Amino acid sequence: MRSPVRDLARNDGEESTDRTPLLPGAPRAEAAPVCCSARYNLAILAFFGFFIVYALRVNLSVALVDMVDSNTTLEDNRTSKACPEHSAPIKVHHNQTGKKYQWDAETQGWILGSFFYGYIITQIPGGYVASKIGGKMLLGFGILGTAVLTLFTPIAADLGVGPLIVLRALEGLGEGVTFPAMHAMWSSWAPPLERSKLLSISYAGAQLGTVISLPLSGIICYYMNWTYVFYFFGTIGIFWFLLWIWLVSDTPQKHKRISHYEKEYILSSLRNQLSSQKSVPWVPILKSLPLWAIVVAHFSYNWTFYTLLTLLPTYMKEILRFNVQENGFLSSLPYLGSWLCMILSGQAADNLRAKWNFSTLCVRRIFSLIGMIGPAVFLVAAGFIGCDYSLAVAFLTISTTLGGFCSSGFSINHLDIAPSYAGILLGITNTFATIPGMVGPVIAKSLTPDNTVGEWQTVFYIAAAINVFGAIFFTLFAKGEVQNWALNDHHGHRH
């Protein structure tokens, strides 16, 4: 007897158009074992790669505190008196051998923001190049270049603010190709019914990189000095690159150690989804409403993500008035929750498709709604509860944690609608989604001149409203099947 839940899940207009060859009604290849498989080895190596990507991105946020002369930052102290002190001030005695710089708050903002000015430039070129030559070398050298540049951060800082800003922008150029390149690789490696699992494992490394690198950078600064933060993470990046080049291949056909059974399983599952066209159908891509649904969702999600990533430590310190030790731990807690949520939601999403017969579109909608509406609700709640420290931390943690559901929602929808051009599509959406990282924190700072609870409520309400709009837009206009323009004959209809 058929489950009515399954029937409902399929009743979204996709019954005859969901081009996922492993769904019921199409030939089903027996899944190749997971243990020691080439595709899961790729996911694990990618996990550590994106761990390093985010460690290299956020380590400066911690090191900068130790790089700047405390007398300079005291002039910019904006700690609010709206909430009472609830922890005793601590005296931090640690290694002070690192050089100090006279950088005011505005200069520090330019240093931290310069990364995104490079990052936004290489999104679309990265996706295009990956679609032509493969993502392995592009991703590898993108991280290697960023790691090597990170090693030169102390020298650049000594030379002045200008060289340091240029260095960070160059690091952004290197990291800008990483996500599009990875998407391009998964278009050849991820069977449709394993996409959520494989991609959530890969990209969850970014969240864990944030969780670990924030407190670890603080520990390195405490016991050594800030220069070793950059030497440590830069060296780790170089070691990862050597493993990546040795163990990974662009496609299953090129992999030297993949089993014949696994290779045939992957290739057969993707047989009706990939295009052999050499030219990129730019006009149909840019006219595609499902692509713009992802753009809007990606932009909306990142507005909240980057606002919290850059300003959560500020909110913890200046409004909730946690001391520096508590702040480091509590600011990383939401990303630990998000990491766990990404891993678990990937498993759940693929189970809904494989075992419960939910359509691709239905799963992407459900997970995007949870991952965007949920954070919006708890962000608003965090603004309402004011100085209740425990609830504020709990709500902000839950908000960021629920955002992890999006890793199985709009975040991988590029592979559903155009697997052959997934890297290019991610480059397009991530270009727009980088804008919040550049302007969101600036707008938030301008909205909180007096650092009152009411001003921060406005910041949270705006982020929540943008999230809700993105969720609704994606739900209305997203698709879950390969689009006609992404197939060999994009002027005809594929049956």
From Swiss-Prot:
GO terms for biological process: amino acid transport; monoatomic anion transport; monoatomic ion transport; neurotransmitter loading into synaptic vesicle; response to bacterium; sialic acid transport. GO terms for molecular function: carbohydrate:proton symporter activity; D-glucuronate transmembrane transporter activity; sialic acid transmembrane transporter activity; sialic acid:proton symporter activity. It is found in: Basolateral cell membrane; Cytoplasmic vesicle, Secretory vesicle, Synaptic vesicle membrane; Lysosome membrane. It catalyses: N-acetylneuraminate(in) + H(+)(in) = N-acetylneuraminate(out) + H(+)(out); D-glucuronate(out) + H(+)(out) = D-glucuronate(in) + H(+)(in); 2 nitrate(out) + H(+)(out) = 2 nitrate(in) + H(+)(in); L-aspartate(out) = L-aspartate(in). PROSITE patterns: MFS. GO terms for cellular component: apical plasma membrane; basolateral plasma membrane; cytosol; glutamatergic synapse; lysosomal membrane; lysosome; membrane; plasma membrane. It comes from the Eukaryota. Glycans are attached at residues 71, 77, 95. This is Sialin. The gene is SLC17A5.
